[in-house]
Amino acid sequence: MANPSSFLLKRLMSITGLLPVGGFLVQHFFSNSYVFISPEAYNEHTKFLVSLPMVVLIEALLIYFPILLHAVLGVAIIYRGENNFTSYSFFRNWMFFFQRVTGFLALIFIATHSYTTRIKTGLAGEEMTFNYMVDILKQPLWFWFYFVGVLSAVFHFCNGIWSFFVTWGITVGPKAQRVSSAMTMGLFVVMGIWGVGILLKFA
């Protein structure tokens, strides 16, 4: 019989990863895709988002708190020895390893990106514009930091969907899990190209 606390931890982990954190990532990609239209369209959309009522409270409750909770739950699961390299295939064990690594990298990236584009600009009274992002991403070190960060966040989200399906009993057999793995890795490729494409428009 499963440990009740372990059962709860895994389900909280999967929910906070898929819904608020994953939802934010997808929404972020859609919002930044205005850059494909024009710099002006990107600036207008960014200005609209920043002007939303209680935007700071919304970000705190729907973005930053869930991400922090997801990170804490992840550390708790690793500390308890959950999801070790024992019960799955060689490939899936490596996916668990990369899930942990990309989770750590994504957390650093999200924290840095949030500080750079929200906190720093807010304290300085600056606007987060197309040119602001260009000034950041034209610097090679920053570009590669964003490149690794975006791909880490995308992998963590997509591979997390596979884990979500297993955790909630949606994919229970080996065949279903193989199909799910192929689908989520396909999603990783699509979203990875999407995210890198956005970065290149700024760079």
Region roles according to the model:
Residues 1-203:
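Membrane-embedded alpha-helical bundles that constitute the cytochrome b-like, heme-associated redox core
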